[in-house]
Amino acid sequence: NESHQLALTAFGAPQEHYQRSGSGAALTMSEWNNVRKYMKDGMHFSRYNPTYGYDDYGNQNSANYNVYHKPQISLNHIWQIDHKSSLSTTAYVSLGRGYGRTAEPGLNSSYSYTDLTYGANYGTLSHTFRREDGTFDYGAVEFANSPNNPIYDPNSDQFEKMYAGSQLVICENRNDHNWYGLTSTYTNKFADVLDFYAGIDVRYYQGKHNATISDLLGGEYFIDATRAKVKGVNNAAALDPMWQYEKLTIGDIAYRNYDGFVVQEGAYAQLEYNQNNWSAFVNGSINYNHYWKVDYFYYDAEKGKSEVLGFLGGTIKAGANYEFNKHHNAFINVGYISRAPNLDYGAFMNAS
């Protein structure tokens, strides 16, 4: 049909790589100069990663590693209504799967969270687990976590040896989302000098966020210190000491487990004017955002769903441009923007 075009598109680019944590791994200028001694000939010191290293068997490891794949499938339809107007509509789905590694200290751990997560602390390189060549010593972490290196019970008069599991582990902070959406744009050329655009944008997003233990780093189990922060009034499981001190292993979830939901509806319109040396536009948009969460860690099934928060936003913008010649022009733009806050650290106090 000459008036209709239909296209199905699918693409994705899986990626995985080591990474350096942002502000947490930041070093002072003098400290960056100090790490030059660790770099091989020809390698710039800015490529130094404080958490990249090896275990005692030469296996590479890093508490900062990222794996993600976010393929998108879209169905596009273009309808040429007449010689002046058209309607373009796209329905799409995006299924993101992946994680970024982070470190987590265990119950009564004497090791700093920043030592393993960032390899640095307040701009200074951490040497708690540092080899002479500057790489991170995961072998030393594994020894510290092993049953062969027990700590002493501070509550015992005899200071009996006790084993409290891994004092540091690596978790995969997972972000698995399903995102569905539809956009549609109507275009009409009212006259030789006027173009009109209007459209809608509807989206639904569900993101599953948890921290899955992926490496016990030489230990036999892990006791999640975060469980002590869970209130029994919110989650009845917290009333059971066996739950608070449960011995977790690879594949178990620690310190966070929730789903985030976002529903967005929006509409917009724009009118453009072009004649001789003048061009101008005026546009407006309106949107409404619905946010809610379902928490499975800090709350039980009856209390896990939050209230649904709604935010109305929109924009009004206008502008004009005058072209004096091909080298010079003058323009002015004015506008007002109102936007909804982000889901995490905005609509809700924190990400967990």
Question: Where are these predicted regions, by residue range?
Answer:
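Extracellular loop and loop/strand-boundary signature of outer-membrane beta-barrel proteins
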Residues: 1, 58-63, 72-76, 167-172, ...
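Charged/polar interaction segments and conserved charged motifs
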Residues: 1-10, 19-57, 224-237, 272, ...
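Structural signature of Gram-negative outer-membrane beta-barrels, strongest in the C-terminal barrel
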Residues: 189-195, 201-205, 218, 233-243, ...
